[in-house]
Amino acid sequence: MADAATEAAGLRNFTINFGPQHPAAHGVLRLVLELDGEVVERVDPHIGLLHRGTEKLIEQKTYLQAIPYFDRLDYVAPMNQEHAFCLAAEKLLGIEAPRRAQLIRVLYCEIGRILSHLLNVTTQAMDVGALTPPLWGFEEREKLMMFYERASGSRMHAAYFRIGGVHQDLPPKLIDDIDNWCDNFIQTVDDLETLLTDNRIFKQRNVDIGVVTLEQAWEWGFSGVMVRGSGAAWDLRKSQPYECYAEMDFDVPIGKNGDCYDRYCIRVEEMRQSVRIMKQCIAKMREPAGQGRVAVDDNKIFPPRRGEMKRSMESLIHHFKLYTEGFRVPAGEVYVAVEAPKGEFGVYLVSDGTNKPYKCKVRAPGFAHLQAMDFICRGHLLADVSAILGSLDIVFGEVDR
């Protein structure tokens, strides 16, 4: 019989594929895991299964035609990405959206934040075995998607933001319905917390799992909830306010342990803060200062209204030129970042003075978070991989692009 040392030398780690057809793999993620028994020794994320060449496609389209591609990046909260691209193009053009358009944009970006956090919190609970939260969460997401549809005609890929404003104004009834929804939604968040926050099993699966220190968060290029969970109050809406966020009164929740449980708690609290911002937006839209146009009054950038086109030949020509050739953007380069639900979503836009972007580099927050899977998962059990993955909040549309 061989001695123990020879046996130990003959042992080798077990390698398995986690995904891409795995229910906890969130889309098309493929992880190659190296296991020593149940303990994870190495994680190798394989990306690219949802690569569609978005950045190259944007170079072939006019600035207006590029907007729908941003809906298809983080398709859980589409309008937040459109926001970054529109702000970047507006910066190059030297224009600013009217006040009402800014309020509508911020309102819908916060709806997107709640859409994303609801999906994440409830599916994270499902990944560790709780089956009730997703049913409650998806009921609320359905109502929010109806608000998307009533504004833009589409439940997911809205293409509602425009360079210089938004596509059309919101009907008063829709604003009232969003207001009423905000009042009732807080109760849903409380119910979710009753189920999860002090739940013994949920805490056992999340507390002290996937710990990220603040130094590690900065080193790996984390942003959003991943940084706030580690104790830094870094939120672009507060630290580098854009549009009308500077006027909004809200708090930035932070964690102290940097584990999965802290990140869950932050997302729950951020949903409450988003409702606060939405209520403020609605109040400001009802004031006289919040009335008016929802796009810039420049027919070289934003198409004229249908009524004008029926009366004015010049308006018809503007409309035709905008939708066939598009408008020209002055040469230059700009980087604009917004606080998307997943973290800092940035757009680096380079213009060469033509009607199409020369280069549009997308900085997806999930990409930086996914590359850290290896160092976060090492030493944890196989069952913890899905809990950690859930708390990173990764969507593959933006990772693979």
Swiss-Prot record:
TM helices/strands, residue ranges: none
Domain of life: Bacteria
HAMAP family (UniProt xref): NDH1_NuoD (MF_01358)
Quaternary state and interactors: NDH-1 is composed of 14 different subunits. Subunits NuoB, C, D, E, F, and G constitute the peripheral sector of the complex.
Family statement: Belongs to the complex I 49 kDa subunit family.
Name of this protein: NADH-quinone oxidoreductase subunit D
Listed GO CC annotations: plasma membrane
Membrane topology recorded in Swiss-Prot or TrEMBL: Peripheral membrane protein
Cell compartment(s), UniProt: Cell inner membrane
Record key words, sorted: Cell inner membrane, Cell membrane, Membrane, NAD, Quinone, Translocase, Transport, Ubiquinone
Enzyme Commission number(s) of this protein: 7.1.1.-
Chemical reaction(s) catalysed: a quinone + NADH + 5 H(+)(in) = a quinol + NAD(+) + 4 H(+)(out)
Gene: nuoD
Cell inner membrane recorded as keyword: yes
Enzyme class per UniProt: translocase
Function description: NDH-1 shuttles electrons from NADH, via FMN and iron-sulfur (Fe-S) centers, to quinones in the respiratory chain. The immediate electron acceptor for the enzyme in this species is believed to be ubiquinone. Couples the redox reaction to proton translocation (for every two electrons transferred, four hydrogen ions are translocated across the cytoplasmic membrane), and thus conserves the redox energy in a proton gradient.
Gene3D superfamilies on file: Cytochrome-c3 Hydrogenase, chain B
Alphabetical list of PROSITE patterns matching this protein: COMPLEX1_49K
Source species: Rhodopseudomonas palustris (strain HaA2)
